[in-house]
């Protein structure tokens, strides 16, 4: 499948945060999210840290800072009778359970559907938690695509899909991304790429295990654009890691203030 505004399309630069609707693609219009300018999270699940998402615009790879990468992770479900539709159905229904420990995905009650906004609370070095989110750009029976908001580690999207190759069902995750700002780019150079690869390797391993399969995850990495976009260095203002760190440092003060807020409500 393709995304509505590819990275080489000038429209992606002209309208940051706005996603082309399915009007140009009537055959599968119901599978595409409607046009949005900013994200909104109205009912955050209990336990989810809801910062760095509401009011943020969506960003394609064109709006990112770092080098542009396309990474493809796939695992053959050899020996399984699961069809691509079966794989995607299970992946959507159990998406958070396939992630590595200490990483949390708070999606909608109805699963993964076009236009949904999910909160992410991700583990970071030093026992910090990065709070960010994703937008469900596309979802059908055999694939679904997430797009990232301002402040996320990456500007871009990730597509999860399943297909049949040589009579074997394959599960795949493919990202097209840039680090969103210079701080994230340095982090990727200092081990972030390895951590990202390990994350999706573990996810696909967990998925294949769910189907009773033990196969090696295959990886293909291509640097699509080696240039860094210095005019996007200002993206650091939205850096969700920095904002999450500040939020965590303020936790003791919020706890101390909680009784006083409760008194005012009486």
Listing of model-derived features with the role each one plays in the protein:
Residues 82-83, 127-131, 181-184:
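Short, surface-exposed beta-strand/loop "edge" segments at domain boundaries and coil↔beta transitions
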Residues 89, 93-97, 151, 167, ...:
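Short, intrinsically disordered, mixed-charge
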Residues 125-166:
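Hydrophobic-ligand binding "helix-grip"
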Residues 150-195:
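Beta-strand/loop substructures that line and gate deep hydrophobic ligand-binding cavities in soluble
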Residues 2-125, 240, 244-266:
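Hydrophobic ligand-binding cavity/cleft-lining segments
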Residues 179-180, 186-224:
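A conserved amphipathic terminal alpha-helix motif
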């Amino acid at each position: 499948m393709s995304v509505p505004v590819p990275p080489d399309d000038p429209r992606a630069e002209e309208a940051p945060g706005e996603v082309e609707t399915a009007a140009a693609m009537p055959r599968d219009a119901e599978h595409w999210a409607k046009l949005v300018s900013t994200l909104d999270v109205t009912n955050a699940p209990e336990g989810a840290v809801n910062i760095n998402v509401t009011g943020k615009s969506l960003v394609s790879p064109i709006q990112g800072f770092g080098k542009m990468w396309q990474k493809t992770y796939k695992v053959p479900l050899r020996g399984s009778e699961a069809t691509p539709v079966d794989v995607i159905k299970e992946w959507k229904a159990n998406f958070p359970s396939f992630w590595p420990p200490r990483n949390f995905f708070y999606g909608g009650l109805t699963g993964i559907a076009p236009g949904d906004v999910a909160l992410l609370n991700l583990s970071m070095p030093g026992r910090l938690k990065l709070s960010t989110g994703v937008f469900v750009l596309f979802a059908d029976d055999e694939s679904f695509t997430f797009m990232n908001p301002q402040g996320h580690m990456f500007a871009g999207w990730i597509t999860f899909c399943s297909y049949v190759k040589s009579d074997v069902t394959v599960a795949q995750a493919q990202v097209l991304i840039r680090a969103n700002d210079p701080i994230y780019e340095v982090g990727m150079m200092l081990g972030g790429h390895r951590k990202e690869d390990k994350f999706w390797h573990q996810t696909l391993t967990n998925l294949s295990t769910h189907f009773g399969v033990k196969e090696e995850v295959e990886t293909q990495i291509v640097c699509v654009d080696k240039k860094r976009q210095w005019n996007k260095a200002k993206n650091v203002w939205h850096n969700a890691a920095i904002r999450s760190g500040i939020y965590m440092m303020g936790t003791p003060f919020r706890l101390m203030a909680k009784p006083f807020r409760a008194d005012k409500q009486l």
